[in-house]
Amino acid sequence: VTLLPRIDRWPNLFVSRTFSKVYGMAALRCGCLFSSERHMSFVRKAQSPYSVNMLAAMAARIAIKDEKFIQDYVLEVLAAREVLYVEFEKLGIPYYESQANFVLFQAGERAIEIRDKLRDRGVLVRDRSYEIPGCVRVTIGTRDQVERFLKELKEIW
């Protein structure tokens, strides 16, 4: 869902896109901003002349053209998220439902331990206890990635 087609209808609308999530290009630190020509002229005045490196710009141009890949990937992530929810329910792990490509689950006092043990097994999650005590954030990727995460989590839970 995007409001990009509405930019001409709503003069104060800005739409931003990140290439970090669905496109899997977080290391390139690339995103883009869309608005009316009038608003973009103000943005350009404040923009750094080299705000995006050439490699990131080229990768973004190529990635944005492959709409089918993105649609397929989003559907796969949605299905994988449901698998994750079902398994969390079976394991009795409290979690927060999400509309994003990540889920927070409650690990209590073991949050840092869980993060570290998963890291030792090659699975990276983020401890979010400083924001929500006891919470761990897991990014949802493909079904294979979610199943790998669940396999490792079950062994240490």
Positions of predicted regions on the chain:
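Conserved PLP phosphate-binding loop immediately N-terminal to the Schiff-base lysine helix
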Residues: V1-L4, Y23
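PLP-dependent enzyme catalytic core of the Aspartate aminotransferase-like
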Residues: D116-L124, S129-W157
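Short hydrophobic/aromatic beta-strand micro-patches
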Residues: F34, L104-Q106, T139-G141
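Nucleotide-activated donor-binding/catalytic signature segment of Leloir-type glycosyltransferases, i.e.
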Residues: P5-L13
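PLP-dependent aminotransferase class I/II
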Residues: N12-F88, I93-Y96
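Conserved PLP-binding catalytic core of the aspartate aminotransferase-like
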Residues: V77-L78, E82, V86-R121
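Short acidic/glycine-enriched loop/turn segments that link adjacent beta-strands
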Residues: A27, Q99-A100, E131-G134
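Short, flexible helix/strand-to-coil boundary loops that buttress conserved ligand/catalytic motifs
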Residues: I7, V43-Q47, V74, F88, ...
